[in-house]
Design a protein with these regions (language model features):
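Membrane-interface extramembranous regions
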Residues: 2-140
Length: 140
């Protein structure tokens, strides 16, 4: 049996497979979390109250929810890499802004922990997606 160290193609294949598995796990969890929060923002009165507590107008909550739904759809769809970059950038801005908003009004970890944890899922998804992009460009 040949060592994968002697065959760079085997290392690349294993790395790509691992990155693909990591990407889909992180992206699925991230997408579920974002979809859940978007749905909650549209339907749960306590979430609407939280937006008011943060100082945001009600229409912003609705716009943000629909933007999240669209972002998740684009994240999971086979779209051009540049568009997916913009989706990741948009989610980074949303999560960073949520974290800052909660900290600015003095909320505790029970409030700002959700955007922080979702940010970790975002970072993992983006990291693995970039690894797959690099592997794809090297194979061309």
């Amino acid at each position: 049996m040949e060592s994968s160290f002697g065959n760079p193609a085997l290392v690349t294949t294993r790395t790509t497979r691992g990155a693909a598995i990591g990407y889909w796990i992180a992206t699925a969890l991230f997408s579920l979390q974002i979809t859940f929060t978007a749905y909650a923002q549209l339907t749960l009165p306590q979430v609407a109250e939280a937006f008011t507590h943060l100082g945001f107008p009600d229409y912003f909550r609705v716009e943000l929810s629909w933007a999240k739904f669209i972002g998740v759809a684009l994240l999971l769809a086979p779209v051009p890499a540049r568009l997916k970059e913009w989706v990741y950038a948009g989610f980074a801005i949303v999560l960073g802004s949520a974290l800052i908003a909660h900290l600015a009004v003095g909320d505790g970890p029970d409030a700002w922990g959700w955007p922080a944890a979702t940010g970790v899922l975002w970072a993992l998804s983006y990291y693995f997606w970039r690894r797959l992009q690099v592997a794809q460009s090297e194979s061309e």
